[in-house]
Amino acid sequence: MDKIVYAEEKEHENLTELYRTSGLEIGEGWTEVCHPVFSISARQDGMLLGAATVSRRFRRLVLDYLAVEIPVRGLGIGKKLTELCLDYVRGIGGSALWLAAREPEFYKRLHARETEDAALLADCLRCPDYGKDCAPKELVFYLKETS
């Protein structure tokens, strides 16, 4: 097997099936709603193992999607994809990367902090599964010192 190759994905829609099969809520035309600005994928021998997408919403840069195929979870792919998204945000002068996380502990291990600002959870609060099968937390990675 070849090593895992991480590369920017220009066609964000190519990641839809991975996101959907990973249990993420993603609808048709998601790119028109989320306004993705950066997507990164992890591939090995041409096979898609994982991906992440950063979007611009609510005047913020948001890690909207991160998914890794079940058989390769635990190998550091999700961590690497997150780090590459953070590098992208730093590279364009961003000061923070926001997310609504179903697995907040994963992101906290990477130094994300919980926030009380629930702008990203607004849609979640209207979902019938909120608080039952799904209870995401809003988190933020601060990339520059905040006052």
Residue ranges of each PLM-predicted region?
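Conserved active-site alpha-helix within GNAT-family acetyltransferase domains
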Residues: A101-D129
